[in-house]
């Protein structure tokens, strides 16, 4: 009886683990594209954005959606107000006005500005040659 319960728990946990999008950084996606070309999907979000959280839970948290994304794209989760560096098309994009004490009220990241994104959430796509679509 205990072994059956453990098996059910293990299978349920395995399903939960596989039902998540395997997010990476934009630089990691560009590196992966060099050896195995795939399109890139970028979830551009902010920490204060309610619809961003709903997108995570209801869409990216869906087992079928996450499996499709993991199999067909390099998925990137990008904080539009974060402080990560992005190397793209010979440019280094940063957020020079980032202030950790202003969590949820930071300036837009240069990469977000470069892409022309002004609202969140935004899902951006790049083809397998890293061209912004």
Where are these regions (language model features)?
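Bacterial Sec-dependent N-terminal signal peptides
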Residues: 1-22
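Short active-site neighborhood of thiol/selenol oxidoreductases, capturing the structured segment around
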Residues: 36-53, 75
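N-terminal "domain-start" segment that seeds a small globular fold
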Residues: 17-35
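Detector for the c-type heme attachment site
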Residues: 53-57, 126
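Short, flexible loop segments at the rims of nucleotide/cofactor-binding pockets, characterized by
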Residues: 19-20, 54, 98-103
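A structural micro-motif
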Residues: 19-21, 39, 73
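Thioredoxin-like thiol-disulfide oxidoreductase module
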Residues: 26-31, 63-133
């Amino acid at each position: 009886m205990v072994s059956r319960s453990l098996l059910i728990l293990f299978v349920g946990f395995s399903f939960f683990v596989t039902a998540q999008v395997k997010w990476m950084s934009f630089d990691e996606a560009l590196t992966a594209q060099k050896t195995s070309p795939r399109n890139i999907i970028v979830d551009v979000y902010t920490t204060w954005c309610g619809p961003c959280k709903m997108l995570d839970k209801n869409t990216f948290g869906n087992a079928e959606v996450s499996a499709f994304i993991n199999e067909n794209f390099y998925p990137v989760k990008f904080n539009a107000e974060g402080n990560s560096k992005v190397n793209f098309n010979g440019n280094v994009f940063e957020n020079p006005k980032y202030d950790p004490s202003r969590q949820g009220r930071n300036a837009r990241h240069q990469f977000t500005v470069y892409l022309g994104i002004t609202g969140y959430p935004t899902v951006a796509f790049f083809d397998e040659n890293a061209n912004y679509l």
